[in-house]
């Protein structure tokens, strides 16, 4: 099977010139930020303008590059075409799930024909939508951010995402917004009188009904484009980062299954923080705990190789020092392109 395995590098991503969106995510504490910064650094060598975006509330890319970033794209020191920015996108809390949104949309459609009941159902739908759906403000901000990125004409965008649960909800935003906006615009006669009242909920401010409809239509066009690109493997891919431990492997499998369900391409896995212990002249590992840890990692590496034989599995070592600053990130990023370097720390 070893002969059939794909190369353990990110060369396939660097060579795919059609890619526009690259997401990097996984369980917390596995080194996602270092990997996303390194991937962005490598992309800056082979692509035009590259943008790195942190959607993680912790915003670690500033610490990684030793440079403060804001919600405005800023040139990364030491690079000529790599920019970075941090946005707040935290869809947390309990509320209406996608299944509930589907039911609300269906109810609104069924009552479209009745004048009084239709208006009441429309109002009820918007009230539930405003009060019960967590992250709608973040979803709108995400949509506006995508429009901004498009206007700035970046060749490729790398997302340093938050831990898995947050990221999966974030990736649902385009589909959710497209369904809701499409339904509301199809029922303008029913919702029209209430759009001003609920305009603030959509982050669109005040204005006349016609202005509100125009803004919503424009946003819907951007959301449809974004949704189509996210589900196009020529435009979008997701890089999963994990470590060789049970919980991380379990969450990686859950993430891959959910990405497949959402129609988002993923064919790269980065296994980070691997031990390559020192040995004596006879080849015996000199550190007993290091040997035990390596044995555990080897077990899960074998499972990863078996489960994901159709993935590019990049295996990165645990280093003796932190990877911080542009030069160190660039140096570390070479390990993602040249696997042969990873047996030497």
Swiss-Prot record:
Domain of life: Eukaryota
Cited SUPFAM superfamilies: P-loop containing nucleoside triphosphate hydrolases
CDD domains in the record: ArsA (cd02035)
GO process terms (BP): detoxification of arsenic-containing substance; positive regulation of insulin secretion; tail-anchored membrane protein insertion into ER membrane
EC number: 3.6.-.-
Subcellular location: Cytoplasm; Endoplasmic reticulum
GO molecular function: ATP binding; ATP hydrolysis activity; metal ion binding
Binding site for Zn(2+): 287, 290
Active site: 56
Membrane-crossing residue ranges in chain numbering: none
Coiled coil start-end: none
Keyword Nucleotide-binding: yes
Family matches, as InterPro entries: Anion-transp_ATPase-like_dom (IPR025723), ATPase_ArsA/GET3 (IPR016300), ATPase_ArsA/GET3_euk (IPR027542), P-loop_NTPase (IPR027417)
Sites where the protein binds ATP: 27-34, 245, 272
Assembly mode: Homodimer.
Entry similarity comment: Belongs to the arsA ATPase family.
Protein name in UniProt: ATPase asna-1
Biological classification of the source: Eukaryota, Metazoa, Ecdysozoa, Nematoda, Chromadorea
Name of the coding gene: asna-1
């Amino acid at each position: 099977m070893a002969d059939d395995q794909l190369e353990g590098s990110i060369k396939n991503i660097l060579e795919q010139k059609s890619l526009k969106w690259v997401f990097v995510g996984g369980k917390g504490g596995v080194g996602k930020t270092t990997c996303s910064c390194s991937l962005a650094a490598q992309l800056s060598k082979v692509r035009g303008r590259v943008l790195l975006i942190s959607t993680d509330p912790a915003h670690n890319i500033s610490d990684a590059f030793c440079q403060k970033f804001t919600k405005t794209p800023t040139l990364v020191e030491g690079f000529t075409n790599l920019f970075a920015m941090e946005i707040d996108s935290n869809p947390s809390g309990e509320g209406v799930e996608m299944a509930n949104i589907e039911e609300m949309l269906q109810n609104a459609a069924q009552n479209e024909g009745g004048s009084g009941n239709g208006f009441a159902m429309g109002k009820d739908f918007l009230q539930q939508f405003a009060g019960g759906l967590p992250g709608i403000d973040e979803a709108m901000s995400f949509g506006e951010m995508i429009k901004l990125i498009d206007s700035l004409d970046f060749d490729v965008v790398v997302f340093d995402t938050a831990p898995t649960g947050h990221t999966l909800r974030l990736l649902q935003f385009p589909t959710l917004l497209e369904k809701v906006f499409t339904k509301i615009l199809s029922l303008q006669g029913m919702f029209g009188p209430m759009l001003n009242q609920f305009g603030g909920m959509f982050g669109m401010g005040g204005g006349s009904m016609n202005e509100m409809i125009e803004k919503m239509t424009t946003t819907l066009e951007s959301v449809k484009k974004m949704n189509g690109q996210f589900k196009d493997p020529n435009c979008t891919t997701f890089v999963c980062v994990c470590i060789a431990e049970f919980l991380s492997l379990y969450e990686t499998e859950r993430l891959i299954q959910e990405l497949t369900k959402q129609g988002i391409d993923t064919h790269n896995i980065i296994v980070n923080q691997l031990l390559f212990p020192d040995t004596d002249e006879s080849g015996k590992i000199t550190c007993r705990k290091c040997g035990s840890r390596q044995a555990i990692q080897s077990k899960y590496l074998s499972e990863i190789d078996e489960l994901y034989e159709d993935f590019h599995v990049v295996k990165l070592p645990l280093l003796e020092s932190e990877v911080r600053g542009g030069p160190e990130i660039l140096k570390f990023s070479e390990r993602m392109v040249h696997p042969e370097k990873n047996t030497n720390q």
